[in-house]
Amino acid sequence: MAYSTALSQGISILLYVHAYTEKNCLNYLSTKVISEQLNIPVPTTVKVIRNLNNAKLTVAKEGAKGGILLAQPLSEITMLDVFLAVEPGKDLFKIHTDVTLQGQDVDDVKEKVIHHLEGAEIAMQNYLKDIRLTDLFHEEKKG
């Protein structure tokens, strides 16, 4: 798979910001604190937060008392929202199609591989869109 750990980091950041702001009455949370508490390197934290801000999942405030807050309730944010924020425009599968073999059979196989892998990506996105971040607190364990 071609994705980074940014999805899980983005989810962790949003959950941490939610928990912190619920407990501390909407105080902005600094990137440094988020980085330290979640053990994510500062440059990575900055990049993920920038992507979350660009997707309007968080709002940022500059300055000494700055940091980030959620831009909307956690119950309105899906895992797909976070995925699209932190992995913008990336395909799930990188497909090798530059082969020496040629012919209709080869082209048909390539098309089928691409079709099925694109279907798998769509299925994953459909699955993620049904999971709200608040569901992560209340999910039943499946055996």
Model-derived features: positions:
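A short alpha-helical element within helix-turn-helix/winged-helix DNA-binding domains
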Residues: 28-39
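Alpha-helical residues within the helix-turn-helix
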Residues: 36, 53-54
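Minor-groove-contacting beta-hairpin "wing" of winged helix-turn-helix DNA-binding domains
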Residues: 64-71
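Conserved segment of winged-helix/HTH DNA-binding domains
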Residues: 74-98
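C-terminal regulatory/oligomerization modules of transcriptional regulators
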Residues: 95-143
